[in-house]
């Protein structure tokens, strides 16, 4: 690796870190321990807990021991709460954080149509966006995709490729992707480097603290 490449990577890592630090409380709010009470309220998890209680009662384990097992947070997180449930709850929580932030922007007046989880007629997307902000006078829109992480593989990586590396933004429509996770240190000019480098350069990949400035810049709001 050349010195120039190393400098580019170091610069990007600092940029990611500086942006993430401003949003660290959001990431903490999406932690398993923070969301635990919401996890165990999910019907699928309640069924697992009830089934476990039933099976344990058929053994010589006492009621007190059963209660202690069920109340063991670490045990439940590892064995009773599926990754899919965690992902769904965490995703919904992240969506709500972003929704509340957008609705708090008083500068988005009656000229703006703000919608959540609806298709935007201005720009066709493969999936329903998490939100869009449409200036009805200018007929310009920001279309938002919320993704806690873009580097976890599978669906996350595909989304990154679609909305960052192959972004279809134009003069009238801008597609952006909001994230929450702090990625592992980037050590080479790999796909993760390309995602963050292009995303930051074009203001299409961002943490929540940058959303207000990007909206104002795009719609030229003073």
Where are these regions (language model features)?
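Solvent-exposed, charged helical/coil patches
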Residues: 78-107
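Nuclease-adjacent, charged terminal/linker segments that flank catalytic cores
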Residues: 1-73, 81
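Domain-level recognition of nuclease-like catalytic cores that cleave nucleotide substrates
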Residues: 179-222
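Surface-exposed cleft-lining segments at the edges of enzyme active sites
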Residues: 80-88, 114-121, 146-154
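Structural alpha-beta junctions
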Residues: 104-109, 168-175, 196-210
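Catalytic cores of nucleic-acid endonucleases
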Residues: 147-195
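Active-site beta-strand-loop-beta-strand hairpin of nuclease catalytic cores
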Residues: 126-127, 132-143
């Amino acid at each position: 690796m050349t010195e120039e490449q190393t400098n580019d990577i170091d610069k990007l890592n600092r940029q990611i870190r500086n942006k993430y630090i401003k949003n660290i409380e959001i990431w903490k709010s999406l932690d398993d321990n923070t969301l635990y009470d919401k996890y165990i309220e999910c019907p699928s998890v309640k069924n697992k807990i009830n089934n476990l209680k039933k099976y344990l009662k058929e053994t010589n384990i006492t009621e007190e021991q059963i209660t202690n097992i069920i109340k063991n947070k670490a045990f439940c997180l590892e064995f009773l709460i599926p990754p899919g449930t965690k992902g769904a709850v965490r995703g919904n929580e992240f969506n709500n954080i972003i929704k509340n932030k957008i609705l708090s922007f008083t500068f988005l007046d009656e000229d703006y149509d703000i919608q959540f989880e609806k298709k935007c007629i201005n720009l066709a997307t493969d999936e329903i966006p998490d939100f869009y902000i449409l200036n009805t006078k200018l007929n310009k829109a920001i279309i938002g995709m919320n993704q806690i992480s873009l580097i976890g593989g599978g669906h996350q990586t595909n989304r990154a490729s679609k909305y960052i590396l192959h972004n279809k933004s134009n003069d009238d429509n801008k597609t952006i992707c909001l994230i929450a996770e702090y990625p592992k240190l980037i050590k080479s000019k790999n796909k993760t480097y390309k995602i963050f480098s292009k995303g930051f350069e074009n203001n299409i990949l961002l943490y929540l603290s940058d959303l207000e400035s990007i909206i104002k810049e795009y719609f030229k709001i003073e």
